[in-house]
UniProtKB/Swiss-Prot annotation, chains A, B, C, D:
This is Chorismate synthase. GO terms for cellular component: cytosol. The lineage of its organism: Bacteria, Pseudomonadati, Pseudomonadota, Alphaproteobacteria, Hyphomicrobiales. Its EC number is 4.2.3.5. Pfam families: Chorismate_synt. HAMAP family: Chorismate_synth. The keyword Cell division does not apply. The keyword Membrane does not apply. GO terms for molecular function: chorismate synthase activity; FMN binding.
Length: 366, 366, 366, 366
């Protein structure tokens, strides 16, 4: 991962600011011959789109994606639009930028935001809506992820919100069907009901709250991952940590593994039907030695509470003067919610990349 | 990060297997003119060296480093050996490889180890001592880290073990001086005393236990980090996750941030003496928007229990037959202990790399 | 250089096909605070634009560039638009695509073109106007080059056509002023007059002809270049060879150096005024050991004749049947002409990249 | 290509100075399961080894390679040593360094050498035998090339010297068998006889002379190459230009193509037996649009005369004082000779890399 590009053979370069002309990405290295329509990408973008419930920002962006390059159709493709192996550029024009008065955030450093650090690094900053540091950039990732999914049709990637504030779900209630049926991408219907009340109160307070997201990839063949410094878990950790507001990433049992003894942590094996081991547990989260084991790849990450809140906080401005600050504007009370489709996209990109890398160096996948 | 290389301008490529001829690394991109003696590197290696207490593997390796290239001294350097800007190759020859009977691990897949996944990926595996997947590779990282520290002389990097099994230290007792005075790199003298008894029991049981390590970098100037996909925290997450047996990484408050409300998580600011903000808290762990804030960079990571234990576990062998397995040999009952100097090395490498990157694209550091 | 991205700290990713929706690039790693208007880029694009004389393709493309991201202006910038250090996306929409009948090139492999090889590699091909393999892609390079020039304001980069077909210019007549005054970018007025007659005849024959271009960068400080595999000349060779139809690249005396004896090839030195050597000759073309010497960097490259000609050539079609083929459509009789501004752009990008890399690893430039 | 690493999936990182402890490389990304013995590598190194005739430097280096990692053998491999997919570190210890008086080159800038530019870049320089800028580094490339050849067993790579000073060979006399039978790697026996007399005279004069080398790869399948910025010819151009003293690179007809008309340059096609086109000519040198066509890949490059000569040349020293300088020591009168096996190695590495990249992104090779 480097600057605004990630991936090695399946490479994604994103661009764009929150209130600029457009944002988007170039997906380079996508194999040729895959069916890809704008609608495939739009469907994923719509899941992430703001303004779909009262629990996400009220900014209204259609987030309409345009494919600028890298696909082709003619009579020989039977009318289907196929990837050609050349770079796929995707663009989403910004429409609802509200060219309002930005003087407040122009001069002030909002606590928890990247205002001060961008100024410290670059000496200049597009402060409108957070500029490049806005979570709006993740729309480009979701678009890229939709392409990545085409590369790995045998792999199912799903994510869910498993904790909001201090309230974890009851894993016994886990039902993937539920994820699409509440505004929180929550797999536990009971927890979702609780979150509704809880987040309404947070929202009315002008406050915000953190969350934990879990991403699961099923159908990952054993053998993906490039030890030592392109380990599958290392790449996933970087991918998830690069999402806005993420402060922690764990694989399988994660931090809980530290408290275990070796006997309890070992994923025992029995003979499987297909000639490969059947694991009796998955503490490892599907990755051993940086390489996938064939078990579901399980990643969790923590999102901090949205930094924009209505309670006044102490801060300073660009001139070093001390100020008290509240952050007006349209914001997500729990930015973790919209991180759910973003997490799926990052998982898809990493797995697509490692699939191509494995095939390149080790021949076909097992 | 890609395959066996990490870093962008300060680049480290490691090589070597646990029981091969030698292991080491090539450090590419180190600035010229830095004083570097083998002793500087050796001092760091000695901290990681096995066999220093009864709590780490009894393998006896002197881990003597040789500098093969990239340094120079003559009368004009006043006898000091200086880096020249060319690649610095470092080699550590293996001596205590015990060419014993490996038939057991040759054919069996040890639970929790990378035996099956390396076979699945490569179809062949140097099983002696774990081969490339052995934590012995981290000696090369520690050597590279010693070079990295030369690049960032104003930054102090220290790590400590803050949890062993279920037993966290009492942070009120934190004393960096203690870290060098017990075999656990533990900053809490009282906890260290407890660990001694606790780990002795684990060791005698032939069992093992996990740990949590915390790494802190002080004196990091604001402005380091390359958004969006080379964020400082994303690179640190990948760096730590690439260490053997690590299952989780967090920055600042990490997973605890998920349970906070926005008011509690915001690091408020007041005017500082040096013209930059003084932060009243550091929930963010020194990183905002992927860029360092000037506050201490704080990273924690979880290490799973050593997978090699004496309790029989169910497994399969290469031929798919079911077996019961115990893992004999010399092992660390808590592999997290020796991860402490490794974590410092990875932090040093990442910060050296980002220092050079920032200087390249944004001019001098603030 | 890798896939559709080149550069290391100053990185350019291009996208787009000849007859697709749009083409463009993302310039990543551009330092912040540089004044950049669309007009700056447009001026360079206009030099490369087709249809400006009867000697280039009659395709009419306004080649209007849009800056989608990475720049910012407000009252604090005094109305000037500045780069922000974030990725600069540039887009040029295709307008004159002539959705005509492509059935001929759809099924046939035009000799000298990339039709067969793209099919062999990808199994699918956007054949309209050559798709991704069209020289139209170089518009994106020229746009990126305009940004690169901002990074290296002290360096003057100029290119010229120095040979058309078998007719080399007379170097004694070299006058940079002439380059802008004839449709060939030719620095020798007399040769330009000859080329007019010569190329008219070629054009009327439905034939085409090759060319040699020379690019010169003056004001390059000594010290740029990253030995061993990022040598300045190696990067320039790759950059120029990546331009469509280029078949050879040389630095300084180039191939002529093979015929020299050591005494004649050595660039002798005398004391310079500024404390650095003054070179008495520049056979080396400004690069020694892969590092700039402070002398002008001189690169020449050969462009093959345009492959699209009206004389029938033997070929085969996709089905393997033998055919005779002429290539109708709008084409440049000497594609080398429009390679002149492209060459300047590539030189600018490589020098900008190496300037940042040098600054990163070696501190400020000498 | 970046710093001291080249390649993307098949990656080579070299290290070492002319008179340092050792030089070598790490080959990363080599597929597993390939038979590789030190003898395979040694055989290639012996072809490049100095001191084999009076026409190359009299330095006596056994250039004995050691494989430090990345290979494995046991009873299951039938005693054969196989690659394991992990990094292959290769080391050649320096033995004949002659720790003589270097005071002359320590303080002086030898014309044509990298002395001044390394000082300008790094401010410090290992001047012993040229340090990192010595052609001794190419031993590491030859070693890596021997590994690369294992990756592409169906491809035959051969190089030859085709011009020495002003004397080109007669291509009608081309006989690959001759290449191993004269000290010049010359395929024309008659030219070789001439070179013997010619180079003897050059040598006795204390002078030197340039050369042109041609490298040919046969059996390259169509489809290798990664447009736009990882084109096969662009990568080859960088690879060859990175060899010491190279000043020009061309593919196929190269610079001669500039003088051709389109009709003469087009490589016509007829139906082939294997379903792919049979080309009637190969002006393109086996590459169209940056992708291999299945025809032999033909690359030529020019090597300047060795800069170390016994005729005094004007120069300056580190302090800026003007001096006259001759370069004593052991040198090659025609450094192009030993570039022949180096060129083969670079071709092998580039083709191995592109073979893996193609397989990764486009499935199996045609």
């Amino acid at each position: 991962m480097s600057h605004n590009t990630f991936g090695h053979l399946f490479r994604v370069t994103t661009f764009g600011e929150s209130h600029g002309v457009a944002l988007g990405c170039v997906v380079d290295g996508c194999p040729p011959g895959l069916a890809l329509e704008a609608e495939d990408i739009q469907a994923e973008l719509d899941r992430r789109k703001p303004g779909q419930s009262r629990f996400t920002t009220q900014r209204r962006e259609p987030d309409q994606v345009k494919i600028l390059s890298g696909v082709f159709s003619d009579d020989r493709t039977g009318g289907r639009q196929l990837t050609t192996g050349t770079p796929i550029a995707l663009m989403i024009e910004n429409t609802d930028q509200r060219s309002k008065d930005y003087s407040e955030i122009r001069d002030s450093y909002r606590p928890g935001h990247a205002d001060f650090t961008y100024d410290a690094k670059y000496g200049i900053r597009d402060y409108r809506g957070g500029g490049r540091s806005s979570a709006r950039e993740t729309a480009a990732r979701v678009a890229a992820g939709a392409v990545a999914r085409k590369v790995i049709p045998g792999i199912t990637i799903r994510a869910a919100l498993v904790q909001m504030g201090p309230h974890a779900i009851d894993r016994a209630n886990w039902d993937w069907e539920q994820v699409g049926q509440n505004p929180f991408f929550c797999p536990d219907a009971k927890a979702a009901a609780l979150y509704e009340t809880y987040l309404d109160a947070i929202r009315k307070d002008g406050s915000s709250v953190g969350a934990v997201i879990e991403v699961v990839a099923e159908g990952v063949p054993p053998g993906l991952g490039a030890p030592i410094y392109g380990k599958l878990d290392a790449d996933l950790a970087a991918a998830m940590m690069s999402i806005n507001a993420v402060k922690g990433v764990e694989i399988g049992d994660g931090f809980a593994a530290a408290a275990l003894r070796g006997e309890d942590n070992a994923d025992e094996m029995r003979a499987g039907n297909d000639g490969r081991p059947r694991f009796l547990a998955n503490h490892a989260g599907g990755i051993l030695g940086g390489i996938s084991s064939g078990e579901p790849v399980v990643v969790r990450f923590a999102v901090k509470p949205t930094s924009s809140i209505l309670t006044p906080r102490q801060s300073v401005n660009r001139d070093g003067a001390e100020i008290d600050l509240i952050t007006k504007g349209r914001h997500d009370p729990c930015v973790g919610i919209r991180a759910v489709p973003v997490a799926e996209a990052m998982m898809a990109c990493v797995l697509a990349d490692h699939t191509l890398r494995h095939r390149g160096q080790n021949g076909e996948r097992p």
